[in-house]
Amino acid sequence: MDSDTSSADFHSTETLVSTPKYSYGVLINVILLVSWTCFRVVNWFLVTLPSILLGMLSKTFQITLSLSSILMFVVAVTAICFLVVRYKYLTRYSRNSAAKEPAKKSFDIDDLSKKKKSSSKTSSNYLDQFLSAIQVFGYLEGPVFHELTRNMTTQKVLPNEVLYLDESLGFSIVVEGTMQVYTKVTNLSNSSLNAEDDGLDLRYENDDVLCIGNDKYQLLNEVKSGAPLSSLMSTLDLFTSNEVPLSPTKFGSYSLTAVTPLELSPNNTGGNSPPPSLAPEIVARPKGTTSTTLAIIPYTAFQRLHKKYPKATSHIVTMVLTRLYKVSMNTIYNYLGLSKDILDCERNLNAETNERLPSYLSKGIIEKFHKTEESASVEGSPTLPRRSTVNLRALTRQASSSRYVVLASRSKSTHPGDLLSSVPLSRRSDYYETQTIPNESEDSPTIQRSSLRRRASHSTSLRKSNSVLEDIRVRGFSNEREETEETSLRTAIVEQIFTHLGISEDDPTVMNINPTSASSSASSSIVGISKLNYGSLDSINSPRVDPMTSIRSSLASNGNKVYQTINQHTKEADVLQEKPKKVVLPGSRGDDSDFVAVKDEFARAIQMKYIQPGKTIIEQDSFHTGIFYVIDGSLDVIQESNGKSKKIYTVKAGGITGYLNCLIGMKSLVSVKASEDSSAIVAHIPSHMYSKLIDKFYFLQLPIARRLKRLLSKQFLTIDYALEWCHISAGDILSKEGEPANGFHIVLSGRFRVVKFKTPFKPVASKAGHDTYDYNDNLIDESNKKYTSNDVEILGEYGHGESIGEVEVLTASLRKNTLIAVRDSETARIPRALFELLSLQNPSIMVKVSRIVANRLSKKDSEEILDKPLAMTSSDSPYISSNFKTITILPTVSQLPVREFADKLVQALKAIGRNVIALDQASTLTHLGKHAFDERLAELKLSGYFAYLEEKYETIVYVCDTPVKSNWTSTCISQGDCILLLADADDEDTAESIGSYERLLIKLKTTARTDLCLIHPEKYVTPGSTSIWLKNRVWVQGHHHIQMEISPTQTTSVMKPKIPIISELAKKIKDRANPNIKLKLEEVKGKALASFVKLNNKINAHGRMSFNGVSVHKNDFLRLARILSNEAVGLVLGGGGSRGISHVGVVIALEKHGIPIDLVGGTSIGSFVGGLYAMDYNTVSIYGRAKKFAKRVSSFWRILTDLTYPVTSYMTGYEFNRGIWKIFGFTEIEDFWLRYFCNSTNITNSTMDIHETGYSWRFIRASMSLAGLLPPITYNGSMLLDGGYLDNLPVSEMKKKGAKYIIAVDVGSVDDRTPMNYGDTLSGFWVLLNRWNPFSKHPDVPNMMDIQLRLAYVASVNALEISKKTPGVMYLRPPIENYATLDFAKYDEIYRVGYVYADELFTSWKSSGKLPDIAGMGDKVRKDMSGEHVSLSRRNSI
């Protein structure tokens, strides 16, 4: 056992000792192997390989080839190289430009409207409907709103009840259901409304006429929930307890107090019916079989509001006057043509007031002006100085005091001791009507009693005694009360003007207000809608006794009704309620010194003027003329219409003119001038001073507005009551397709887009004569369907002053289109019932509206005739008038030259004759105050200011010069009809992303047209750069390239340009270059420029056209102004092969005569020349590039090498394609400096395609592809051929682009219309002999090719005839009949023919005055725009 163990240990020890020896042996073997391998490799390279090479080189080879083999090899190699170069290298342009253009994403029609479907559902919340209706008062602050609505009550009207609307009870609002409002038409009861008895069918609906007894009521309007039932004008009488007596011209406030229920009962017929004067003028009833709920604000709430918050009262009065002007007067004058109702206001105003100035005051000013006129030789109206050296101090008047008037007329030498020159005198002219002064002489002044300056005493008896017993014979004298004759005259004039305006010192609406405080603390109030009569108030002073108090009971409970109703079914009237008593809220009369201060302020604003005979002081259609008071003489009021002047009436001494113009800010409807045979002396209060004083003394607005209301006729107030003032936010829908046409709209401000669904409903005629939808054909639920741009068609737009929907109203049909507000807009809605009522009373209205509709339909028919050649076009861009009212200039990012751009655009708009104003934040704040955008209350004033500007100016430019988060930025976006999005063309970062202002534009979801204005430092566009801007901006509808310098500071702040490596390397090489080489290069450069100048002078007739600077007619801002103002000039060049070279001469002649071009379009060769002009906008490059192309196309060898087997065409098209590509390169149509389009014939879809985007060479080649000669160009699977097959002169498409004037150049072959008569059969041999027979009288019969060509151009011939008759077209046809289609080798000859023809034609047109007055062509424009930046006309070399 031990031996075994010891042996094992021995073996293990041996193994451990032998292991290191084995490891060393393996390592040595590896080293030896690697060494041996390296030796073998080195040996092979150093010994074996050289030996092999030497052996091979020492051998001899011999190859024998025949000549034919060598030639074949060379031909094969050459062919392979040619094919590789020809189809691999030389066609790279085709493969690069064949990539599909990124199509813009189709937008959802839901994006056009922000209106949610849930909002279309009628809300059952009374408060929501009430808040919607109370917006007619403008924005009301919290306390004011609470005071106005704290005593509001509701009344429910059942379906079988008729409501007698008494507007003196309060202001009512429909919060649930629909009310039908009727007006009494007693004057038509025996004629028009009974016409059906005579066999005439007037087609009244069942609900149009309501009979109560013998009285007939005609439907006036339907008031839906959320709309006021009361007239806004009626609120003027709710603020005061002194009710104005009813007059024949008064409307709306007819009380039921004089009418009993039995008299108004339907079963009361015959002679027992009440007199027509006692019957209510306005009644209402619920529509259909559903009840209606009214919310009523009692009149006491308005009186309390007037007492506590007089400033809020002035705001409501401002809203009333604003609506009166914007809605009622604009509609009545501009659309309905009832100008007499408006002009009668001022005539009646002067007829009611016959007072004149005292003779002792007027005589002095008359003598002074006549003496000044006789002594002065300078032309103009002498004006009296505003104030004399003596200051008038407004002091508190005592009962026994008077005025001490120093008469300047009495300080003459002829009256040295006249005692009457220093006596206290009255300013009233009617003193002698009540007083008798003995021993009156001619020279003595008229001594009168003062009635307008009576001080209110604390005692009523003292006040009465002062007003009655005040007499000049008992007055004392006071030196402190001394006046000069001038100050007394001014005060007397103010008093006379106040009398006209309805301002009286005794008016409680004036004297109960303290102008120094806008509000007072809230007094105690009675809560509860049942106590509308405020019977618990102890402070009621002198309540007015109501005539029907005995038959009325007080509203003691909530269940009693405010308005009286009559049950139609039971024919029993409800118990008459007692009319609430008028409340006079407590308060003392203000100090007379306040009113004296008011008159003194107005007196300071008066300007005395002498008007020469026949001189006009107010021009028709002018704004803010002010009020004129006639002191002496007379003024003629003249209305001009259709070039004829008509004298309406004469304003004599003591009258005023300019009343409505100054009062509500409307434009003057008449011209006012002095009589031809005599001069006039007037006192003038400028409009801006009047507005300033009215704002200061705001409590004067209420009596002025009440006086105006009393002057309006009943018909005017009826129209005002029924008209609706609609406010539509941007993106909201005004009317939907398929809705009943129950009225038409007149656009007051804003813009609407007309949209039509391509899958319309199917209307069927019903028995009643109305169109209804037949839903039985397709019962498909489309309520949740989203419509995309492919499902809708944009038909056009409606702008300021245009009317919408008359045709549907006249034909009693459904709406055919959908109207969407482009921006925040306002319309005046004329209900169908009101229109029918007015048509019965005034047939002239129907005649005028019929003419408007007929003119519109006639224009539409002419446009449809014009569009007939384009019935097959694939262009879906509608004709939309680009005469934008408001233009917003919005940058993409900050630090862009927005203000400089706006200044240049405004200057250009003025240069073309537009009345334009630019608005930025600073100018708006200057006019409206620093809180114009911060207070919600200022929104009314802001919108009113914008509306006034839209009425006064043709174009308003909103300059967005504020940060993104500014309120002014959002205001600019919301106010724009067209938004010009400014961008720096070199800003690559913004091009591929979205700017900060663009994000706000997207967020606001505006639907206004948005055009991208790319600003370039030079007239050069990098090929392909424009599409980068446009491909991701689906909200951009167009773009313009504008040359304008951007300051270096702005450039660095906008972007950090990347310096190309090549440019940097070139700069370094230039710095290190030899000075001698630099001088040599400069010398070569100078020679090159000199040669270019020579070439330009040769082309432009011996240097007549300057090469030194940009001509005025090529100014980019003038071009942009014409496009935005619908004054654009379009150039259309027709097709005709080589005859189109004459287009080059015509274009150069246009440049010579300074005729601007804004849009370019063409067909075939016209698309080529037009593309050159639109791309370069320069005649030098056009001439050189066109000549280069003509030389290439006319090359015999190029044509020969391009021939192919004529299966589709005789030529492959390669040489032709490359010739065009050599000219245009990779420039896209979007890169052209001018807006451009060309047409082609799509033989795949049988349509005419209009190309405005994409690679220019490809679509110009498509437009020039003659069938048989060249193969069609394929694009998106369609084959495109020459556009001349359908329209060889696309004038109609240019008209759709908005061009007002179109210069159309036709170079097509003459259509042979020789009569043919060869019988019913034709022999080919006879045709051949007929052509060879020189004595034959028969015309040559066309061959098969001629017939195919004529057949191909049938559509084009008809389109040409229509193009010649298009309005605004200047048709030119150079004498090029002697040249063939392929005579490109005669370039210079054909060019000269076109140039000489156009030059002579334009010269003759100018001399004879036939050339249209194109905006931007006049000498004045050249002078005004001559200060623009000047640079080289051409932008790159040929």
UniProtKB/Swiss-Prot annotation:
Gene3D superfamilies: Cytosolic phospholipase A2 catalytic domain, Jelly Rolls
Topological type in the membrane: Multi-pass membrane protein
Domain PNPLA: 1131-1295
Lumenal side: 47-64
Task of the protein: Intracellular phospholipase B that catalyzes the double deacylation of phosphatidylcholine (PC) to glycerophosphocholine (GroPCho). Plays an important role in membrane lipid homeostasis. Responsible for the rapid PC turnover in response to inositol, elevated temperatures, or when choline is present in the growth medium.
Reactions the enzyme catalyzes: a 1-acyl-sn-glycero-3-phosphocholine + H2O = sn-glycerol 3-phosphocholine + a fatty acid + H(+)
EC id: 3.1.1.5
Keyword field contains Nuclease: no
UniProt GO molecular function: lysophospholipase activity
Main subcellular location of this protein, as a coarse class: endoplasmic reticulum
Disulfide links within the chain: none
Protein name: Lysophospholipase NTE1
Chain ranges for the short sequence motif GXGXXG as given in the UniProt record: 1135-1140
Compartments reported by the entry: Endoplasmic reticulum membrane
Residues annotated as the enzyme's active site: 1164, 1282
Motif DGA/G mapped to chain: 1282-1284
Family: Belongs to the NTE family.
